């Protein structure tokens, strides 16, 4: 009924459409365009620069370890040292029902010079009650931390991430 050319063209258009839908859904809500909208292209481009400097990597990994300890905290706020952790304080999860945390933080990149810099991380955190029921959590999120050396100690001074 249709010439063979039109049949192939419709088939190719259908395949192209399905491929686009699948690839867009795979990106989730925080694809590259969402990151660019929130952070701007210049900051998103920072994530492509690999840091190989061992000193800078140690600073970043030490701060990531501190953040993981803070995110892994379960319980009330009693006995925590919130004053000494800078902007990482926002990652404390105070809930008396939480007895276990499943936290993952990956270093994306870092750059430091003249006592200031930034760290890009990708993280997720889930919190469970005594019955091992999820009570709170978030999927993977990218976060950019501004860092500064204050009184000889590297500190996260600002956290920027998509809400």
What are these regions (language model features)?
Residues 2-14:
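Bacterial N-terminal signal peptides that target proteins for export
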Residues 31-106:
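Core segments of small alpha/beta cavity-forming domains
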Residues 140-163:
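Short beta-strand edge/turn micro-motifs at domain boundaries
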């Amino acid at each position: 009924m249709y010439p063979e050319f039109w049949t192939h063209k419709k088939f190719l258009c259908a395949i192209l459409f399905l491929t686009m839908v699948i690839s867009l859904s795979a990106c989730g809500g925080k694809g590259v365009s969402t990151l660019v909208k929130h952070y701007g292209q210049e900051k998103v481009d920072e994530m492509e620069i690999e840091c190989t400097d061992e000193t800078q990597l140690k600073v970043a990994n030490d701060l990531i370890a501190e953040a993981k300890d803070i995110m892994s905290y379960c319980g009330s706020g009693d006995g925590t040292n919130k004053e000494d952790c800078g902007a990482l304080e926002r990652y404390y999860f105070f809930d008396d029902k939480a007895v276990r945390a499943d936290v993952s933080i990956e270093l994306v990149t870092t750059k430091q010079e003249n006592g200031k810099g930034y760290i890009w991380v990708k993280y997720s955190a889930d919190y469970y009650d005594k019955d091992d029921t999820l009570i709170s959590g978030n999927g993977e999120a990218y976060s950019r931390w501004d860092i500064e050396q204050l009184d000889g100690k590297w500190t996260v001074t600002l956290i920027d991430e998509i809400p």
